[in-house]
Amino acid sequence: MHKAGQLGLCARAWNSVRMASSGMTRRDPLANKVALVTASTDGIGFAIARRLAQDGAHVVVSSRKQQNVDQAVATLQGEGLSVTGTVCHVGKAEDRERLVATAVKLHGGIDILVSNAAVNPFFGSLMDVTEEVWDKTLDINVKAPALMTKAVVPEMEKRGGGSVVIVSSIAAFSPSPGFSPYNVSKTALLGLTKTLAIELAPRNIRVNCLAPGLIKTSFSRMLWMDKEKEESMKETLRIRRLGEPEDCAGIVSFLCSEDASYITGETVVVGGGTPSRL
């Protein structure tokens, strides 16, 4: 009798966990949160911005070009989502400051930062990379996420904490031939995530990392632009398809939600089964 009662309690508890994890008991897990997403007018960034807004957040999108910002905002607002936007070149201090100020002015604070902006200005041997290319790659891909995080921390502290997600790449674990400085910069983000997580945990700010594999975007176009090349890439994946931007979005929303409140300093790989160990 006692065992039967215990089994009943366990079954009900498991059912509650299952329902919660499937979203059956709670809607809008990011309700009233304010999210900044850099490089979010196309590809992975756009999919993340859309998902955060669908899950209840007020989202501020950004990009280097006003035309792209306007188009993304119009599309997402047309879907009934709470989205605004501003131009932001993450390598420029004044643009980073404006992005933060825009969110605070419109929504009263910041709860979430998704640092997605990146460049890959070079293809070839590491021995042929110029100092100029190194500076540009590390400035945008590594230094800017660190400084962007620094800029939002005071606003997150005012709201009792927050969540940062830094977008790295499968190239951090398995370097892509020819993408030499890009590979190095994306590996550096794994260390940045760990370091920020340790430093910001006492402030109730969690920092995690997303490492997408081969996702079908304009950024990765040269890897899949013809059918033969695409089929060849699929053969290297355990899940025999290329990823879509939406494959990354739900994971980021989860990491920004209370469901991930005990997760920090971690990297989640969305790579179709691509080996991902340093």
Swiss-Prot record:
It catalyses: a secondary alcohol + NADP(+) = a ketone + NADPH + H(+); 3beta-hydroxy-5beta-pregnane-20-one + NADP(+) = 5beta-pregnan-3,20-dione + NADPH + H(+); 5beta-dihydrotestosterone + NADPH + H(+) = 5beta-androstane-3beta,17beta-diol + NADP(+); 5beta-androstane-3,17-dione + NADPH + H(+) = 3beta-hydroxy-5beta-androstane-17-one + NADP(+). Its EC number is 1.1.1.184. It comes from the Eukaryota. The modification Phosphoserine is found at residue 220. GO terms for cellular component: peroxisomal membrane. Substrate binds at residue 169. A motif (Peroxisomal targeting signal) lies at residues 276-278. It is found in: Peroxisome. SUPFAM superfamilies: NAD(P)-binding Rossmann-fold domains. Signal peptide: none annotated. GO terms for biological process: alcohol metabolic process; ketone metabolic process; positive regulation of reactive oxygen species metabolic process; retinal metabolic process; steroid metabolic process. The modification N6-succinyllysine is found at residues 92, 216, 227, 234. One of its GO terms (molecular function) is oxidoreductase activity, acting on NAD(P)H, quinone or similar compound as acceptor. It holds the Pfam family adh_short_C2. InterPro entries: NAD(P)-bd_dom_sf, Sc_DH/Rdtase_CS, SDR_fam. CDD domains: CR_SDR_c. NADPH-dependent oxidoreductase which catalyzes the reduction of a variety of compounds bearing carbonyl groups including ketosteroids, alpha-dicarbonyl compounds, aldehydes, aromatic ketones and quinones. Reduces 3-ketosteroids and benzil into 3beta-hydroxysteroids and R-benzoin, respectively, in contrast to the stereoselectivity of non-primate DHRS4s which produce 3alpha-hydroxysteroids and S-benzoin. Diplays low activity toward all-trans-retinal and no activity toward 9-cis-retinal as compared to non-primate mammals. Homotetramer. The C-terminus peroxisomal targeting signal tripeptide is important for peroxisomal import. Once in the peroxisome, it is involved in intersubunit interactions. Primate DHRS4s display different stereoselectivity and catalytic efficiency in the oxidoreduction of some substrates as compared to other mammal DHRS4s due to a difference in conserved amino acid residues. This is Dehydrogenase/reductase SDR family member 4. It comes from Pongo abelii (Sumatran orangutan). The gene is DHRS4.
